[in-house]
A protein has these predicted regions:
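Conserved serine/cysteine hydrolase catalytic core
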Residues: 211-257, 262-266, 270-273
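Active-site catalytic motif of lipid deacylating hydrolases and related acyltransferases
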Residues: 46-104
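Gly/Ala-rich beta-loop-alpha elbow adjacent to hydrolase catalytic centers
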Residues: 111-116, 120
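A cross-kingdom C-terminal cell-surface attachment/processing module
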Residues: 302-325
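Flexible "cap/lid" loop of the alpha/beta hydrolase fold
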Residues: 129, 135-179, 217
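Post-His helix in hydrolase/transferase enzymes
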Residues: 273-288
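Cross-kingdom Sec-pathway N-terminal secretion signals
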Residues: 2-47, 61, 70-73
Length: 327
């Protein structure tokens, strides 16, 4: 079942609390339960040209995590770019993506998983070509919020089991210099299956993903958002109901606040790995109709056409009755 929703909390937290939230930034697959009244996708914009789909990964992943989604979209004729997210700083990552978006001609459907959601939120602001935002178990921060703050809003993340630990217990922190807070964060191999995948993949695939994960700086999760694209661009949201990285309740909060067209999928944080079809279908919906859903607006083009047809039918019927009475 699919649901329509949208979601903001803002408080400065110590590094001990913020680091755990970092664990919320990856990409993955799922099974879907729908909530919402979005229109059926046509796979094209109003001009008939298919938009370019840009995919942005998050923490502990890389662009290859989108492979099956890329294949599925390309099979249907969509231009696709799976970008390499630097994972260094939110502003720097957003600037990097924004430059890529400016080089793309025509409409864009912008998709972010995990921390990638925070990046697309900042990068898309002010770009008229971005017609849809799609959050795949991703952060959708408001202005001045950080990813780590949002990850700590409600329980559900298993990035740490000791809130007083200097580094979240599921993470390894690798120093990048003399400053002890300047670290790269890795998800421990022995925690990867549970935290990132909810123990839903076979051991061989899990070990490959753990070995090839890309780290992110703690600074990237601590940097406040400056631009909020979901306030002006229609958004879609996939909520993973077994998300142990960001936490399912945190996903629901953000989706509801953003008034996103939302689906809930029985899946882990790494939804693309377990449920690529559900991810693909939501992207296709966003690509097919970038307007807000009927539940939000109360009307759409199809409703207007049907309403017009109904009015004509009633008018014609009335005329027939009048003529019959006169003859």
């Amino acid at each position: 079942m699919k649901h329509i929703r949208r979601t903001a909390a803002l408080r400065v937290l110590p590094l001990t609390v913020l680091l755990p939230a970092a664990a919320l930034l990856t990409a993955g697959p799922c099974l879907a339960s729908e909530s919402g009244g979005g229109t059926t996708p046509t796979g094209a914009t109003s001009t008939g040209a298919k938009p370019t789909v840009v995919l942005v990964h998050g923490y502990w992943a890389d662009a290859s995590g989108w492979d099956r989604i890329v294949q599925a979209l390309q099979t249907q004729g969509y231009p696709v770019v799976a970008t390499a997210n630097p994972l260094r700083s939110l502003s720097g990552d957003a600037d990097y993506l924004a430059a890529q978006l400016k080089a793309i001609e025509g409409p864009i459907v912008l998709v972010g998983h995990s921390y990638g959601g925070a990046v697309i939120t900042n990068a898309a602001a002010g770009n008229p070509n971005v017609e849809s935002l799609v959050y795949i178990a991703g952060f959708a921060p408001d202005k001045d919020e950080t990813a780590f703050q949002l990850a700590a809003k409600y329980p559900g993340s298993r990035v740490t089991d000791d809130p007083n630990a200097p580094v979240p217990t599921a993470l390894n922190a690798v120093p990048l210099g003399g400053d002890p807070t300047n670290v790269d964060l890795y998800l421990k191999p022995e925690k990867f299956a549970d935290v990132f995948l909810s123990n839903r993949l076979d051991a061989a695939r899990t070990q490959v993903l753990a070995a090839t994960q890309r780290p992110a700086t703690a600074a990237s999760g601590n940097e406040p958002t400056q631009s909020v694209a979901w306030k002006t661009i229609p958004s879609w949201y996939l909520i993973a109901t077994d998300d142990r990285t960001i936490g399912t309740d945190n996903l629901r909060f953000m989706a509801k606040r953003a008034k996103a067209t939302t689906i809930e999928v029985n899946a882990p944080h790494a939804v693309m790995e377990t449920n690529p079809d559900d991810v693909t279908q939501l992207i296709l919906k966003a690509a097919g109709d970038a307007r807000p859903s009927l539940a939000e607006t109360g009307t759409d083009q199809r409703t207007a056409l049907l309403g017009g047809a109904a009015a004509l039918t009633v008018a014609a019927g009335t005329a027939i009755v009048i003529r019959a009475r006169r003859t």
